[in-house]
Amino acid sequence: MEVGMIPRVYLGHEWFGAERILSEYQVPEDCGAQVLFLGIPRNAPEDGGNIEALEYEAYPEMAIKEMEKIRQETIEKFGVKEVFIHHRLGLVKIGEPSFLVLAVGGHREETFKACRYAVDETKKRVPIWKKEIFKEGKGEWVLGEKKNASGQTK
């Protein structure tokens, strides 16, 4: 499913950007809420402060199928009108967006919940792997979701 040339579910090296999606998508007249999540790699002190980029890899056929399933589940579960789920592959520098979820719905409450659900389920279920690339050039695969000192998922 696409909006113009922008797919609802996307996994790849090209980045469409939130601005383009928001400007090209015609929001239905009965929708009063759009909730956007952007996942952006960071170089946090708790990670050693030595990360330059993240490199993402995936099993595309399986990942896209699962992303489409999550999109449909989100629409059905929360009654929102539309959901976009995009994830970049390849090298993504610190500060550049790598993951986007946009939920569009009638009201803010279900739209916020839908966006959160799509983000969380994508992180849990979609086979996307990331490697931390350090400033000295070495890389290290991240196994599972990292948690910070307070137990929050990063």
From Swiss-Prot:
It comes from the Bacteria. GO terms for molecular function: molybdopterin synthase activity. It catalyses: 2 [molybdopterin-synthase sulfur-carrier protein]-C-terminal-Gly-aminoethanethioate + cyclic pyranopterin phosphate + H2O = molybdopterin + 2 [molybdopterin-synthase sulfur-carrier protein]-C-terminal Gly-Gly + 2 H(+). GO terms for biological process: Mo-molybdopterin cofactor biosynthetic process. CDD domains: MoaE. Pathway: Cofactor biosynthesis; molybdopterin biosynthesis. Signal peptide: none annotated. Heterotetramer of 2 MoaD subunits and 2 MoaE subunits. Also stable as homodimer. The enzyme changes between these two forms during catalysis. This is Molybdopterin synthase catalytic subunit.
